[in-house]
């Protein structure tokens, strides 16, 4: 999955590692990964990606599990908090587009029932700021969904590793690892 250059460069020097993208080659769409990716990997790094993936959260996690060989490792960072449930910014997201530019961007959504919704004050991440934040996970949901789709040995890591860019300025979004059961 797409991750920061600091991770990708180091991993490429050490392993047979490929950093993938949603918008350019090499492509990996975690919503529907190509057959060639299934059951192939010893480890997958997902660094601040899942909050941008549309569709049900559990689908992306199930597909992450499907990428891994049995016993394979998922290393995951994603914004989460210790609130009761995952916060979906656009719970009826169905057919959507972004209109406008800069601070004037608006998300236009057509719900499954055909109702048009318009949202402003959007939160964008990454690169040129074009990647829309769709949700903030609740840690309890994330942990439960990982287990539900077949991950075991789910661990929250609080140690810092500055050489890898793991610096905890906030306890929310600490790295998580899980093994494919």
Language model: regions and residue ranges:
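A short SAM/SAH-binding and catalytic strip from SAM-dependent methyltransferases
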Residues: 42-55
């Amino acid at each position: 999955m797409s991750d920061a250059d600091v991770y990708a460069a180091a991993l490429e020097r050490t392993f047979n590692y490929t950093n993938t993208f949603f918008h350019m080659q090499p492509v990996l769409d975690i919503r529907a990964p190509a057959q060639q990716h299934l059951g192939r990997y010893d480890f997958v790094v997902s660094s601040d990606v899942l909050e941008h993936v549309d569709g049900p959260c559990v689908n992306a996690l199930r597909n992450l599990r499907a990428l891994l060989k049995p016993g394979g490792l998922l290393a995951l960072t994603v914004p989460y908090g210790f609130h009761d449930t995952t916060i979906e910014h656009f719970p009826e997201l169905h057919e959507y587009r972004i209109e406008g530019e800069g601070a004037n961007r608006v998300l236009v959504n057509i719900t499954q029932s055909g109702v048009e919704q318009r949202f402003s004050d959007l939160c964008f991440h990454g690169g040129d700021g074009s990647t829309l934040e769709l949700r903030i996970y609740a840690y309890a949901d994330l942990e439960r969904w990982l287990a539900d789709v077949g991950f075991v040995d789910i661990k929250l890591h609080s140690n810092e590793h500055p050489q890898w860019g793991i610096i905890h300025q906030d306890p929310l979004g600490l790295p998580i690892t899980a093994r494919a059961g």
